[in-house]
Amino acid sequence: MKKIINPWKGLEGYNCFGCAPNNEAGVKMEFYEDGDEVVSIWKPRPEYQGWIDTLHGGIQAVLMDEICAWVVLRKLQTTGVTSKMETRYRKSVDTKDSHIVLRASIKEVKRNIVIVEAKLYNKDGEVCTESVLSLIHI
């Protein structure tokens, strides 16, 4: 896997909840390229729990949305905004896990709409969450 350099790091005013490294409230995702996929390895934190030791579903949705936007950035060399997101929560994610892995890839491009699929895996490699996003690329 090859690390993707964040092109906005150091830009004045850059404070993305998903990927800004200096946003104290944010999730601070980093990304890697692995063939057709973009990958993120992320450490759950207790402040992002919903129920005791369980990663909040809204935070999972943020992670999925962010990685899909980075797929558009990396693979199409443009930015995109989410127009639709369908998410299935299959298994809870433990906030005590050492890490989780997210993987996403483009499934289809229709004019200015990009369909991206993403999966979130727990530390044991089990699929916990699946999303399909439609993003409008700019």
Can you annotate each of these PLM segments?
Residues 1-47:
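Non-catalytic linker/capping segments at the edges of enzyme domains
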Residues 12, 25-27, 36-38, 58, ...:
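A generic structural signal for short beta-strands and their flanking turns/coil linkers
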Residues 39-65:
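A conserved, well-ordered hydrophobic junction motif at loop->secondary-structure transitions
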Residues 67-101, 106:
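Hydrophobic beta-strand-centered segment that forms part of the acyl-chain substrate-binding groove
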Residues 87, 118-119:
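A short beta-strand signature of PAS-family and PAS-like sensory folds
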Residues 107, 112-114, 124-133:
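C-terminal binding/interaction regions
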Residues 137-138:
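Conserved small/polar residues in nucleotide/adenosyl-binding loops
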